[in-house]
Design a protein with these regions (language model features):
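PAPS-dependent sulfotransferase catalytic domain
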Residues: 59-129, 136-139, 147-160
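Short catalytic-loop micro-motif centered on adjacent basic/acidic residues
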Residues: 48-50, 138-141
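A short, structure-level motif marking secondary-structure boundaries and short turns
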Residues: 1-2, 44, 112-113, 133-135
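PAPS-dependent sulfotransferase catalytic core
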Residues: 1-52, 175-176
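Short, solvent-exposed loop/turn segments at secondary-structure junctions
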Residues: 9-11, 22, 34-35, 54-56, ...
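Flexible, charged surface loops at secondary-structure boundaries
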Residues: 39-46, 65-67, 132-133
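C-terminal accessory extensions appended to soluble enzyme cores
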Residues: 157-176
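A conditional alpha-helix N-cap/helix-loop micro-motif detector
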Residues: 52-55, 120
Length: 176
């Protein structure tokens, strides 16, 4: 069964996949198909764990392809911390795309933190709505990751080295 780690970004998805690389009965990647379109965008191998914040823009297609035949993780981090991290990246990446492409601001009309909070709330609401009728799901919070990741490990029937996986959470990957 496939596992999809849905998230806003800036919430530990890189570390999540580093931890999952200690699982022997699943493959795992971070943003592995981000440049693909059409059927190839969601063409993940079986028994694969994928973390990609852009999946929040493909929830309809994800539901059409996998429906309830996947495990879904809603990876979260305290919203003010996510906003602070995103605010440093207002001029590139997903936050720039959101501000200029979705909100249609050609220049910065609001503080970066306001744009970031709006993006975070929008993406989390979309993910929550998508997960409303899913049976194979779990919330994982960075603030309680030592407990939550063990629950995730058990939910997917992971095999491998849990202690090494948990140790990954002590390393700050992709920080800003």
């Amino acid at each position: 069964m496939n596992v999809f780690v849905l998230n806003t970004g800036r919430c530990g998805s890189t570390t999540f996949i580093k931890a999952c690389q200690h699982i022997s009965n699943y493959t795992s990647s971070h943003e592995s198909l981000l440049d693909r379109t059409g059927d190839q965008r969601l063409a993940y191998p079986k028994n694969h764990i994928e973390a990609d914040n852009r999946l929040s823009w493909f929830l309809g297609q994800l539901d059409n392809k996998y429906a309830d035949d996947a495990i879904y993780v809603h990876l979260k981090r305290e919203r003010e911390a996510v906003a602070a991290s995103f605010s440093k990246r207002i001029d590139f990446g997903i936050l720039k795309a959101y501000e200029q492409g979705i909100l249609m601001h050609q220049e910065h009309r609001y503080p970066a933190s306001d744009i970031a909070l709006d993006y975070i709330d929008t993406v989390n609401a979309n993910i929550a709505l998508f997960l409303k009728d899913k049976t194979n799901k779990i919330d994982v919070s960075i603030e309680t990751v030592n407990t939550d990741f063990i629950g995730f490990w058990e939910l997917i029937g992971a095999e491998g080295n849990l202690d090494e996986a948990l140790d990954e959470w002590t390393i700050n990957y992709n920080a800003s």
